[in-house]
Amino acid sequence: MERKASVTRTTKETDIAITLNLDGSGKADLSTGIGFFDHMLDGFARHGFFDLDCAVKGDLQVDGHHTVEDTGIVLGEAIKKAVGDKKGINRYGYFILPMDEVLALCAVDLSGRPYLNFECEFTVPKVGELDTELVKEFFYAVSYSAGMNLHIKMLSAGNNHHMIEAMFKAFAKALDLAVSYNPKVTGILSTKGSL
């Protein structure tokens, strides 16, 4: 059974439509209006082996905040919907990803309890047209709307482009592991019996 979800969200600030296939091949069709953000989402899809269609119209004449944050909200909702009842999946995933001088850690728990721990200090205000402070806002929105515990930590800092890209790719690899089926897991991986 294909684990796929489509979610739309329309406000006065943004109009977003996302389709996510957790069992895809890494194909992406992206249009957020922020080139560097599209590049990061493309890396997320490719390295997580997710198929991701993401069409966003946002109030970029104001700034990128609503576009990035609301995309995170909708992506998180799509992840939650696509994962479904969580039967038979690993639930946990982690990855440490190198990118040249940079080393990023990401750990995911699809617990149903939202939480973000984000440890990274950027040294420039923007990479391309993306405000670096919005990277944390994006992951916060994803974690809370997906109901996931998400830890992202920069173990070795360097070029800000590399840092952000390493985070998105580490998140992709960790999430791919968390949503993967494990033949040893019967039912839901929790002593409570539900997540």
Q: What is the predicted function of each stretch?
A:
Residues 1-195:
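N-terminal intrinsically disordered, cationic/polar leader segments
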